[in-house]
Regions:
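Long, His/Glu/Asp-enriched segments that create or flank divalent metal/ion-associated functional microenvironments
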Residues: 1-172
């Protein structure tokens, strides 16, 4: 895996003619040589099958039924992320997260998503900081908040916070 400054897992869809397949990308911050897999299985289901890969692949396969505006411009994070979260839960219900470590990974992911919804609202609506702290949400406070509320290495948290700062509403 090629090192990056920040790390993250994400999905890119196939080309319209499927000559380029959909792919799940997994980047790792430079210097990170080991990472726990217990938290990643649920992410594989979220980004891969039956998550975004199935969701985006179906939209591509059925592109003839959708005009360009609906396929490209009218995407909804609520729909896409809602589907991916459903995919995680479905795999758990089907018994694919029965290992206690994998189940803990799913719960850890839910904790992270709850924290990022709070961050998204705080930053993009200019809300006051929590617990009576002076000031409003900004990038520095968002990073501090996430470091206090998620179980991730700082490089991964920085990647996530930068993504949320530039993509309002992506955090359901």
């Amino acid at each position: 895996i090629a090192p990056t400054q920040e790390g993250g897992i994400y999905y890119t869809g196939p080309s319209d003619d499927f000559s380029r397949p959909g792919r799940m990308w997994w980047s790792v911050p430079e210097g990170v040589t080991e990472f726990d897999t217990w938290r990643e299985l649920t992410t594989v289901y979220h980004e891969g099958v039956p998550g975004h890969h199935l969701q985006i692949g179906q939209a591509t396969a059925n592109r003839g039924q959708l005009n360009s505006w609906r396929r490209v411009l009218a995407g909804s994070s609520g729909h896409a992320e809602g589907w991916a979260l459903y995919a995680e839960r479905l795999m758990q219900q089907l018994g694919y997260l029965d290992d206690p470590a994998d189940r803990l990974g799913m719960l850890d992911g839910q904790r992270m998503r709850a924290a990022r919804v709070v961050l998204d609202i705080g930053v993009h609506l200019g809300k006051p900081r929590l617990n009576g702290e002076e000031g409003i949400w900004d990038a520095d406070y968002a990073l501090e908040f996430m470091m206090r509320n998620v179980n991730m290495a700082e490089a991964f948290v920085r990647f996530e916070v930068n993504r949320y700062l530039g993509w309002p509403g992506q955090a359901p």
